[in-house]
């Protein structure tokens, strides 16, 4: 196994809150998958939830070396938790095609949040 990509991102939670205040659900609609949207709608801390998802997806886009462009979209990366609560990534559409093209066999995700920030790191392995 070799490391194919590494990405990290940090998000100021107040920035996400400001965007939601200005534009309502538009950012959440752009960033979240359908499954994540269902969780976001009833989450006790929706701003923090969205900030963490945004950080993971930015980190994943950096790990792939592409950023969010050329057909790649935030909602093609889905963050979910395994049976032990560990964050995982599920890919759709162009993100899945790119992962297959690069030979990605494993994706490692870590995310954390504190009072003002959410951060995430994604490692892609062959």
Curated annotation (Swiss-Prot):
Gene3D superfamilies in the cross-refs: 4'-phosphopantetheinyl transferase domain (3.90.470.20)
E.C. number(s) listed in UniProt: 2.7.8.7
Assigned GO CC terms: cytoplasm
Localisation: Cytoplasm
Binding annotation for Mg(2+): 9, 58
Keyword Cytoplasm included in the entry's annotation: yes
Keywords: Cytoplasm, Fatty acid biosynthesis, Fatty acid metabolism, Lipid biosynthesis, Lipid metabolism, Magnesium, Metal-binding, Transferase
Record flagged with keyword ATP-binding: no
Cofactor: Mg(2+)
One Gene Ontology biological process: fatty acid biosynthetic process
GO molecular function, one term: holo-[acyl-carrier-protein] synthase activity
Reaction(s) catalysed (UniProt annotation): apo-[ACP] + CoA = holo-[ACP] + adenosine 3',5'-bisphosphate + H(+)
Pfam family, one: ACPS
Family membership: Belongs to the P-Pant transferase superfamily. AcpS family.
General function of this protein: Transfers the 4'-phosphopantetheine moiety from coenzyme A to a Ser of acyl-carrier-protein.
UniProt-recorded name of the protein: Holo-[acyl-carrier-protein] synthase
Gene designation: acpS
């Amino acid at each position: 196994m070799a490391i194919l990509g590494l990405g990290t991102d940090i998000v100021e939670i107040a920035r996400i809150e400001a965007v939601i205040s200005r534009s309502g659900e538009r950012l959440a609609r752009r960033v979240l998958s359908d499954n994540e949207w269902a969780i976001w709608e009833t989450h006790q801390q929706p701003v923090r939830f969205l900030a963490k998802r945004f950080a993971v997806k930015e980190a994943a886009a950096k790990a792939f070396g592409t950023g969010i462009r050329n057909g790649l979209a935030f909602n093609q990366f889905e963050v979910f938790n395994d049976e032990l609560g560990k964050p995982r990534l599920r890919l759709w559409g162009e993100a899945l095609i790119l992962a297959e093209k690069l030979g990605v066999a494993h994706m490692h995700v870590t995310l954390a949040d504190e009072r003002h920030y959410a951060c995430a790191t994604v490692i892609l392995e062959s």
